[in-house]
Amino acid sequence: MATVTLNVKTVRPLGERVLVKVSQSEEKTAGGILLPDTVKEKPQIGEIIAEGPGRRNDDGSFQPLEVTVNSKVLYSKYAGTDIKLENEEYVLLSEKDILAIIA
């Protein structure tokens, strides 16, 4: 059986999905207390690393996504599938789970 090495460059989302690199959560509180992983909030902000071709129209063409690679986005808290690639945290989301583009 062949093995496949997954890295960011080999993951290509399908349809209207995007791969988002999750921003790091805060390590300390404002008072300087270190936070263990079990109490850290899951970040909801990240940068789009890869995108699918978009939604397929009735005529077979694709409607492009509203977001683009390198856009910083805010997404729903419980949306998507968490993925760990090359020791970095990513989330695979549908475009509909993206709430806003951050300028």
UniProtKB/Swiss-Prot annotation:
Keywords from the named record = Chaperone, Cyanelle, Plastid
Q: Which BP terms does GO give this entry?
A: chaperone cofactor-dependent protein refolding
Mention one GO molecular function.
ATP binding
CDD domains xref list:
cpn10
Q: Where in the cell is it found?
A: Plastid, Cyanelle
InterPro entries (alphabetical): Chaperonin_GroES, Chaperonin_GroES_sf, Chaprnonin_Cpn10_CS, GroES-like_sf
Q: Predominant location of this chain?
A: plastid
Q: Where does it sit, as one GO cellular component term?
A: cyanelle
Q: Which Gene3D superfamilies match?
A: GroES chaperonin
Q: Which NCBIfam families match?
A: PRK00364.1-6, PRK00364.2-2, PRK00364.2-4
PANTHER family cross-referenced by the UniProt entry? 10 KDA HEAT SHOCK PROTEIN (PTHR10772), CO-CHAPERONIN GROES (PTHR10772:SF58)
What does the function comment of this entry state?
Answer: Together with the chaperonin GroEL, plays an essential role in assisting protein folding. The GroEL-GroES system forms a nano-cage that allows encapsulation of the non-native substrate proteins and provides a physical environment optimized to promote and accelerate protein folding. GroES binds to the apical surface of the GroEL ring, thereby capping the opening of the GroEL channel.
Subunit composition and interactions: Heptamer of 7 subunits arranged in a ring. Interacts with the chaperonin GroEL.
What family does the Swiss-Prot or TrEMBL record give for this protein? Belongs to the GroES chaperonin family.
Q: What is this protein called?
A: Co-chaperonin GroES
